[in-house]
Amino acid sequence: MKKLLLIAATSATVLSSALSFADCGNDSWYLRVDAGAAMFNKEKDNQTGLKLKSNTAFTGDIGVGNYIAENFRADLTLGTTFSGKLKKSGAVSSLGGANISASHKPNITRLLINGYVDLSNFEMFDVFAGAGIGASMLKEKVSFSGINSGATVSTSYSSKNTTNLAYKLTLGASSQISDGVKAELAYSWISDGKTKGGNVNLFGLGNKQVKGTRYQSHNLTAGLRFDV
């Protein structure tokens, strides 16, 4: 948590300095809110060898930014991704061919400083590209279930919070819907780094070290920008 607060303060300082250098008299500030869906990249569960697939997660963020130049803006956003899972069921050869279900459920909070450039300006909408960098606070709950001696058994563990370098690439379009309000539709790819590993006793076979899971996601969001 201390790392995230330190990075938050650093990001705010960097954004403030950039805006000051860009235009000391610029009052073109905006607030933003975005929400949408995320799908994580496929990952391999190192304990069972199962290839995990993602369901649909919820993602959203809020932020404050500035129109630094006619076709360039920057903002600071606080976002989250939750309610998603990487999961898979299948036969595991290392456990005698037993059918095992593995589930990795992350909870992600991220703070990013972002920059965007308008690529083209049409009459009805603008197309933009952007990139962001910052920090993510990441943890996950890992669960296993299966059949052992005719009975259904399960085991799980929760990783500790870890703070990672996070980065984001964005492509989207925006349109003016009323005075001082713009609507956005955007695709973004986000890397939130890797969770911490832990020890898990898988079906009474003794404690084994489980490696962390890397979380990278494809995101589709809709949002609003409010000039202030």
From Swiss-Prot:
SUPFAM superfamilies: OMPA-like. Residues 1-22 form the signal peptide. Keywords: Signal. It comes from the Bacteria. This is Putative adhesin A1I_01215. It comes from Rickettsia bellii (strain OSU 85-389).
